[in-house]
């Protein structure tokens, strides 16, 4: 799995009566993650950034919010804590065997991007939460 990559696609999160659909641009390096989340029409809604000093959520027209973890801010934004390290693993074909209370991950479609095999469509479920990721573009980055 490349240590650094850039990907873009669509993210959907459904939990109970709440459903969020967004465009996602994701840049991952060894030390950080950046998610730029946009509306389906392309308007930037939020930026989630993480690094050695914690994570920051910046929403359009609002003051930046900080937390110790990326997961805490995805929970604030999307209603569910998402671990970018786990999702990077899923993206690169590492769908873990599900244990009680963990995500049940299905790689619904795969693709090849250069020399990298990766998931094109991922569905992850846990309890009443469904997360879907569709990857439209991907490239490994040099560090």
Across the structure, where does each feature detected by a protein language model lie?
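A short, Trp-centered hydrophobic/proline-enriched beta-strand micro-motif
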Residues: 1-17
């Amino acid at each position: 799995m490349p240590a650094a990559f850039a990907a873009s696609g669509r993210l959907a999160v459904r939990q109970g009566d709440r459903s969020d659909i967004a465009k996602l641009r994701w840049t991952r390096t060894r030390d950080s993650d950046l998610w730029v989340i946009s509306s389906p029409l392309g308007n930037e809604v939020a930026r989630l950034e993480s690094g050695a000093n914690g994570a920051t959520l910046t929403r359009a027209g609002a003051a930046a919010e900080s937390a110790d973890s990326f997961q805490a801010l995805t929970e604030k934004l999307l209603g569910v804590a998402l671990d970018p390290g786990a999702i990077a693993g899923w993206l690169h074909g590492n769908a873990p065997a599900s244990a009680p209370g963990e995500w049940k991950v299905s790689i619904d479609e795969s693709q090849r991007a250069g020399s990298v095999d990766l998931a094109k469509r991922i569905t992850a479920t846990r309890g009443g939460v469904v997360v879907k990721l569709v990857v439209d573009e991907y490239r490994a980055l040099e560090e």
